[in-house]
Amino acid sequence: GGDYGKTKRIMSIDRIKDCIDFWYKYLNKDAKDIYVIFFGGEPLLNKKGIKFAVKYVRELLSKHNIRPHFSITSNATLLDEDFAEFLVENKIPVTISIDGGRHIQNKNRPLAGGSKSFDIVNKNVKNLMKIRQNLTARVTLVHEDVGHLVDIVKDLWEMGFGQVQYDLVSTDDPKLKITE
């Protein structure tokens, strides 16, 4: 993952609490269900923060009999067994950002240092699949890979993903942008 030229920072527990308190202040307390999604950047850079947020949101919403529903989108590079168990125990659906099999994944989604990501992602996904059967893959489709969409879906199904979703890349980069 890239940093888009910005300083990388992890949100503190105090900051997370402040954000949740602000959100809660304006929340419709008559709601029956509330959905919280952890995504963007790489949420698993702050596992401690996610665990805190899930617990704290549940505490706040329980005062009003509101059912919280959580989900997370991750590139799975930091998905360890402990956090996988947390996700399963808390019934948090997981979407994995992965662009295809080995070749396409390594080309499109290198690690921050430039090394290949597929083997790490594949291992972590397999570990999660041992305790949670149904995972969704989310593909970001770039110009060069449009003609390989069927192969991408087949590769991901063979990896064990139950669902495959795709989005077209949003960029002005002519090498990536889908123009046809």
Each model region followed by its residue ranges:
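Radical SAM/AdoMet-radical enzyme domain recognition
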Residues: 13-37, 46-171
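A C-terminal junction/extension of Radical SAM enzymes
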Residues: 175-180
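Short acidic donor-binding/metal-coordinating loop in glycosyltransferase active sites
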Residues: 40-41
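Canonical Radical SAM [4Fe-4S] cluster-binding loop centered on the CxxxCxxC motif
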Residues: 1-14
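A short, flexible beta-alpha/helix-coil linker loop
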Residues: 2-5, 103, 171-174
